[in-house]
Structure formats: C-alpha cells, structure tokens
C-alpha cells in the first residue's frame, strides 16, 4: 500500500510524498517494490551490506575459497554480476551455461578445478551417459583453468586448519578484484563500506589470533551483518523513504 501511494503521488504534477517508518525491513520492502517500477528510492537509513551486491559477493567468496570446485558455490561465483574472468558478459554466460549443463548437474564427479577442466577437455562417458556422447569443450576448460589461476594466490591463506584471519581477509579482497577484473568493485558507497568491512574483518581477526579455517566464513558474515551501506543514489526530487529523525527535519505533501 505504501509503495502504491508513493507511486500515485508521482501521478499528480508538483506533488511530493514520503514514507516515514522506523522499521528498516518495511523500508527495504517498499524500496524493492518501487524498484520494479523503475523507481530507485533507497531508504535514508541505508541498506545492510549483506544485501548489497558487493557484500554478497565477498561472503560468497569466503565460502567458495576453501573448496573452489564445489558445484553450487562455483556456479554462484561464475554467475555473479561482478564475475568477468577476462571475458565479456555474453561469452561468459554462454560458457557457464555449457559447463553447468555438461559437468555440474547431478553427482559431483570431479575433485578439483583442474580435474573439472580435464573432464571438459577430455570427456569421460560414464555409464549413465552412454546414450549421449559428450563433446570436448576446450573453451569451457580454459575458463575453469583461468578461475583456478585466479584462485591460486588465495589458497595459501586458507591451506591450514588454523589460519591467520587478517591474511585471509586480505586474500579475499584480492580474490574479489581478480575475479571482477579490477578495483571497480570498491566504487560508490556500498564499495567503500565493503572496503571498510575488509579492514574491520582483518583487525578483529588479528585481535583473535589464529582461527579455524572452517569458521572464517561464518565469522565474516557476523561482522558484515552489523554494517550498513549509505544510499548510493541521489534522493528522488518528489518521493522518499525516511526514518523518524529525517521526517522531523523535512516536509512533503503526503
């Protein structure tokens, strides 16, 4: 209802309106509905970093890094909007679709990324695949080998059961840049907050000493859950989503 009322306000020339609510969850729901109508209205309170693309990407990498060949997390990384791996989006999407169809559905048959690349390049017709001969897919194998190379520098930080959390946080930041193809992921207010997250994660980890590598991803998520990214878009001239404090300082028609 709130989203409809805000949209209705725009249909009256010169009118302005605002949703005033102390509930961050309600503000996010209304903003999501408005976005479906191409109205980018971010709550003035900001957005949890975990709900931002860069935040979700970093947490995904924290879980993927320990077992990069795990099918579900590997696909999530390859399909993420930040992933480029040196290819244009259309080409990458085509290759990822082929890899998913040929090798990542059903039971896991590979142990490592190199094993997966080898199976794509030199298909093995398992018993259940006798009716459908698999074709060599060298371009798909090349993509897997490329992401394996990008992942390689981060392995040292997560190799042992007990790891240096600060080194692990820095490794995740470098891995994110490598997969995305540059430092542009830190752009804007969400990117700046994500960079602050890496710094804070490193400092907290350093204070704790060594930690179990299996616990790092959960710890990273706990740290990120407390962080809010400020709105990265200019305020709409006629409609807004405010908290009670902002509402006391401004007025709208509705």
Q: How would you name each of these model-derived features?
A:
Residues 1-254:
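Polyanion-engaging groove/track-forming segments
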């Amino acid at each position: 209802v709130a989203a409809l009322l805000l949209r209705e306000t725009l249909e009256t020339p010169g009118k302005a309106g605002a949703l005033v609510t102390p509930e961050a969850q309600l503000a996010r729901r209304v903003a999501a509905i408005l976005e479906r109508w191409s109205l980018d209205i971010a709550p003035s309170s900001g957005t949890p970093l975990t709900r931002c693309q860069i935040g979700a990407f970093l947490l995904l990498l924290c879980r993927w890094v320990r077992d990069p060949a795990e099918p579900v997390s590997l696909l999530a990384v390859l399909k993420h909007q930040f992933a480029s791996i040196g290819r244009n989006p259309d080409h990458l999407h085509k290759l990822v679709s082929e890899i998913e169809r040929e090798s990542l559905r059903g039971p896991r048959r590979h142990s490592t990324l190199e094993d997966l690349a080898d199976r794509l390049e030199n298909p093995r017709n398992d018993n259940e695949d006798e009716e459908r001969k698999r074709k060599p897919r060298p371009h798909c194998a090349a993509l897997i080998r490329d992401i394996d190379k990008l992942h390689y520098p981060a392995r040292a930080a997560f190799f042992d059961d007990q790891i240096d959390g600060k080194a692990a946080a820095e490794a995740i930041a470098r891995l994110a840049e490598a997969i995305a193809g540059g430092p542009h992921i830190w752009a804007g207010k969400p990117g700046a907050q994500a960079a602050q997250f890496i710094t804070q994660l490193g400092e907290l980890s350093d204070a704790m000493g060594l930690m179990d590598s299996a616990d790092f991803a959960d710890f990273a998520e706990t740290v990120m859950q407390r962080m809010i990214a400020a709105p990265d878009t200019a305020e709409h001239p006629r409609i807004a989503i405010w908290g009670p404090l902002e509402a006391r300082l401004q007025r709208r028609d509705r």
